[in-house]
């Protein structure tokens, strides 16, 4: 990914953890790309590959190559140095 790439949030519209993660990004004005794995089957396969066969959401892939799966709000705060 290029230096100006955005994090990619893979999730579903019905998942509370996904909604919470997206709300965190929105409230902190962090740009991201949203991918609904219920609509994008290839993305769903990627999430399964990342998570050992599980469709764990949200799965967030960052431009630096790091990945957070089902992160807590605190995990996201630490990732972005937000207290």
Placement of each model-derived feature along the sequence:
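Loop/helix-junction capping segments adjacent to catalytic residues or to phosphate/diphosphate-binding pockets
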Residues: 15, 41, 70
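Thioredoxin-like thiol-disulfide oxidoreductase module
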Residues: 36-54, 66, 81-82
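Non-catalytic, surface beta->alpha helical segment in thiol-disulfide oxidoreductase systems
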Residues: 62-83
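Local sequence-structure signature of Cys/Sec-based thiol-disulfide redox active-site neighborhoods
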Residues: 1-30
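Conserved segment of the thioredoxin-like fold in thiol-based oxidoreductases
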Residues: 22-38, 55, 67
């Amino acid at each position: 990914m290029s230096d100006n790439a955005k994090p990619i949030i893979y999730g579903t519209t019905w998942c509370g953890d996904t909604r919470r993660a997206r709300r965190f990004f929105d409230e902190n004005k962090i740009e991201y790309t949203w991918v609904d794995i219920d609509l994008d089957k290839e993305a769903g396969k990627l999430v399964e590959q990342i998570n050992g066969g599980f469709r764990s959401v949200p799965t967030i892939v960052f431009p630096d190559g790091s990945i957070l799966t089902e992160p807590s709000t605190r995990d996201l705060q630490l990732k972005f140095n937000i207290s």
